Swiss-Prot record:
It is found in: Plastid, Chloroplast inner membrane. This is Potassium/proton antiporter CemA. GO terms for biological process: potassium ion transport. It comes from Ranunculus macranthus (Large buttercup). It is a multi-pass membrane protein. Contributes to K(+)/H(+) antiport activity by supporting proton efflux to control proton extrusion and homeostasis in chloroplasts in a light-dependent manner to modulate photosynthesis. Prevents excessive induction of non-photochemical quenching (NPQ) under continuous-light conditions. Indirectly promotes efficient inorganic carbon uptake into chloroplasts. Belongs to the CemA family. It catalyses: K(+)(in) + H(+)(out) = K(+)(out) + H(+)(in). InterPro entries: CemA. It holds the Pfam family CemA. The chain crosses the membrane at residues 7-27, 107-127, 154-174, 189-209. It comes from the Eukaryota.
């Protein structure tokens, strides 16, 4: 009976993940043609924001300088100007196509994120009872573990999320989210988030250890500090 009670919430959690992903994927595929038509036919703006426009201008200037240098080296001065104009025209078209596809991808991702959030909200509201059962099952499972295993899991989790090697993972994750919402890649902003966000998590986690675990299981705190040292 207990296994059945635990199985139902797990099945419900699996259905949440699978259905939200499948519905979001289907929505993205069905909306792709509409977004492409809307962006290419009815949208007059080339860039989504000023940051992207500045980034495109910098790439265009860099491209123009490289093509100019390449033509100056390969050809004589009397014919390189015409080839330079043709090369700049071709590369400009490719640059515009690249940004155009990127904007469509950003809009689709933004709409998909909204749909995913709405689906998860509906599942949370309708299946609150199942989630409560799952939460109690997880709490019971963790409670039955020994203090040594608990300390090991806590140490492993903290090293993965806020440990010495975690900034590399945070940089990839924040950069992916940053790009997913249509922002141009900015090393300064991403580095700032990577350097501050894990520190905030580390502070919160240490506070929870001091406030909660020290009250519930003092031996676990002692084992954790012994392993950590």
């Amino acid at each position: 009976m207990q296994k059945k009670k635990a199985f139902n919430p797990l099945l419900y959690l699996t259905s949440i993940v699978f259905l939200s992903w499948s519905i979001s994927f289907s929505f993205k595929k069905s909306m792709e043609s509409l977004v492409i038509h809307w962006w290419n036919a009815e949208q007059s703006e080339v860039f989504l924001n000023d940051i992207q426009e500045k980034s495109a201008l910098e790439k265009f200037i860099e491209l123009e300088e490289l093509l100019f240098l390449d033509e100056m080296i390969k050809e004589s001065p009397d014919i390189h100007i015409q080839k330079l104009r043709i090369g700049i025209h071709k590369e400009t078209i490719q640059l515009v196509k690249m940004y155009n596809e990127g904007h469509i991808h950003t809009i689709l991702n933004f709409l998909t994120n909204i749909i995913s959030f709405a689906i998860l909200s509906v599942f949370y509201i309708l299946g609150n009872e199942q989630l409560v059962i799952l939460n109690s099952w997880v709490r019971e499972f963790i409670y039955n573990l020994s203090d040594t295993i608990k300390a090991f899991c806590i140490l492993l989790l903290t090293d993965l999320c806020i440990g010495f090697h975690s900034p590399h993972g945070w940089e990839l994750m924040i950069g992916s989210v940053y790009k997913d919402f249509g922002f141009s890649h900015n090393n300064q902003i991403i580095s700032g988030l990577v350097s501050t966000f894990p520190v905030i998590l580390d502070t919160i986690f240490k506070y929870l250890i001091f406030r909660y675990l020290n009250r519930v299981s003092p031996s676990l705190v002692v084992i954790y500090h012994s392993i950590n040292d």
